[in-house]
Design a protein with these regions (language model features):
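Extracellular beta-propeller repeat domains
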Residues: 2-307
């Protein structure tokens, strides 16, 4: 554990009145070396480019991706009109255009609640929606989609999750990562062949989905369950990620998956007394540092419990 957060002070405000902003760190500041946890130098400047007010989107939660045209593309979780979120395009100067509003089709057949975007090898943007889409399985009125969108805003739904009996292909997908082979890799929070604890999958740009692993395949779910974000492909070619729940100690896991689909649990959280090593890994993919190690956060545990 590198740092243990502790909550101090009083939190105020309501979720319903949150206004999110896209911020830009000046290019000159991005090139500065890491400060090893110290205060950022005065040369680092932040500039607010867009204030989301509900009419242009609300609660953007995923990173932006830069297209070949130099524009920045992103998603907003939901919008004021009650729709299922949107995809937007923004110039580096801050001029924002909404490209697509989800739930534009009856019963949200085009998907709802988008995750982050990924730039494919063909220059198109790909992504997933957490819910919505067309499902033929009872009990799942739309378990998410995999889509492609052009830079002009033409959206094509490529795959509808829960297309197989009992949702063995997964349900409620998270974000994606582009693999070295040109395919996309991701996780789902539900579905799978072992009780609905989520999956790791590979999907081609054309929509051929292969389930690589279904969580809770081991007794007492010691392999983890319910991943909340995409894995990353490390320099060794394997996929690494986290699960929010289960594991040998019940606090979630860190896993490695080979391209052949062999999963190894690298760490089970809450292994130390009072979960001082952390518990319940936070939403957000791991980061591999230049030293080859992986970095991430948990939303529970630690040596400094909240007062």
């Amino acid at each position: 554990m590198i740092y243990d957060f502790r909550l101090t002070g009083t939190l105020t405000g309501t979720w319903g009145k949150r206004i999110a902003a896209v911020c830009l760190v000046l290019t000159a500041a991005i090139a500065l070396p890491a400060q090893d946890g110290r205060t950022l130098p005065d040369a680092v400047k932040f500039k607010t480019l867009v204030n989301f007010d509900g009419t242009n989107g609300l609660n953007p939660q995923a990173p932006l991706v830069q297209g070949a045209d130099g524009s920045l593309y992103g998603t907003a979780y939901s919008i004021y009109t009650g729709s299922g979120g949107n995809i937007f395009k923004m110039t580096p100067e801050g001029s924002l255009t909404v490209l697509y509003n989800f739930c534009a089709q009856p019963n949200c057949a085009d998907g709802s609640i988008p995750n982050g975007l990924v730039l494919g090898r063909d220059g198109s943007l790909y992504g997933t929606t957490e819910v919505g889409g067309v499902s033929t399985n009872p009990g799942c009125g739309g378990c998410g989609t995999f889509f492609k969108i052009s830079h002009s805003g033409k959206l094509t739904t490529i795959y509808n999750f829960c297309a197989l009996a009992n949702c063995t292909d997964g349900a409620y997908p998270n974000g994606l990562v582009l693999g070295a082979d040109g395919n996309f890799y991701g996780t789902s929070e539900g579905g799978g062949s072992t009780g609905g604890y989520g999956t790791i999958f590979r999907i081609t740009p054309g929509g051929v989905l292969t389930t690589l692993y279904s969580f809770c395949a081991e007794t007492n779910c010691t392999d983890g369950g319910v991943p909340l974000d995409s894995p990353i492909q490390a320099t060794d070619g394997n996929l690494y990620g986290t699960t929010q729940l289960s594991g040998a100690n019940g606090g979630g896991t860190i896993f490695k998956l080979t391209p052949e689909g062999m999963l190894a649990t690298l760490y089970s959280f809450c292994a130390q007394p009072n979960c001082t090593d952390g518990s319940f890994p936070q939403q957000g993919p791991l980061v591999q540092g230049a030293n080859g190690n992986f970095y991430g956060t948990t939303r529970g545990g630690g040596a400094n419990p909240n007062p």
